[in-house]
Design a protein with these regions (language model features):
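Short alpha-helical transmembrane segments in multi-pass integral membrane proteins
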Residues: 45-110, 153-194
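Alpha-helical transmembrane segments of compact multi-pass small-molecule transporters, enriched
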Residues: 89, 145-146
Length: 194
């Protein structure tokens, strides 16, 4: 989509594609930190759930949720405040590249501060033996929201639509995660687990 719709803008397909690739490399650093957090809490949740220590499971989830929010906020601020500096690490002599890097980071990462919470929630469901909910959350962002939204929004709004699809997908995935976790903890309350 960057190549196709980038060619229709003043930036051209080369700048759009290379800038998007650069952004994805930086994005992977933040993503890896959140995957590490999610994977680290999974055995704690699993063992405590198996031992019927439901309060510990909820506390672990709460801490993971808070830390994922803090990590996400940290990277969100970097993406919003320093996109030009990040871009200069890769290409320093192109004003068009710098300009598109700002647009790319600030649009694509617009709601990155909520990015980590669905990952932690998916890991939580996997740990407590609810793989269908974990799978639903894992597939939500990419398969159910991001790909269809990218195709629909880019056909309507071009390059900007392709970039705006990610924050919309992240927001929808966050909403799904919150609905599932609130329902889960309410179920625990009615069963007397917590």
């Amino acid at each position: 989509l960057m190549r196709i719709y980038g060619a229709t803008t003043i930036y051209g397909s080369d700048i759009a594609l290379s800038c998007y690739g650069m952004m994805m490399k930086i994005y992977q650093i933040a993503h890896s930190m959140l995957v590490g957090l999610s994977s680290g809490t999974q055995p704690i949740n699993g063992f405590n759930y198996g031992a019927k220590q439901y309060d510990r499971v909820k506390t672990t989830y709460r801490y993971a949720f808070i830390f994922s929010f803090l990590i996400s906020i940290f990277w969100f601020l970097i993406y919003m405040i320093f996109p030009s500096y990040i871009a200069k690490l890769f290409v320093s002599n192109s004003p068009m590249y710098q300009e598109f890097a700002k647009l790319c980071f600030r649009t694509y990462m617009m709601v990155f501060f909520i990015y980590g919470m669905p990952m932690v929630t998916s890991s939580f469901f996997q740990a407590i033996g609810k793989p269908s909910k974990a799978l639903l959350l894992s597939l939500s962002r990419q398969a159910f929201f991001l790909i269809p939204l990218s195709l629909i929004l880019s056909s309507q709004f071009g390059l900007k639509g392709a970039l705006i699809a990610a924050p919309v997908a992240d927001t929808l995935t966050f909403i799904v995660a919150m609905i599932l976790i609130i329902y889960e903890f309410r179920t625990w309350k009615t069963k007397g687990f917590i």
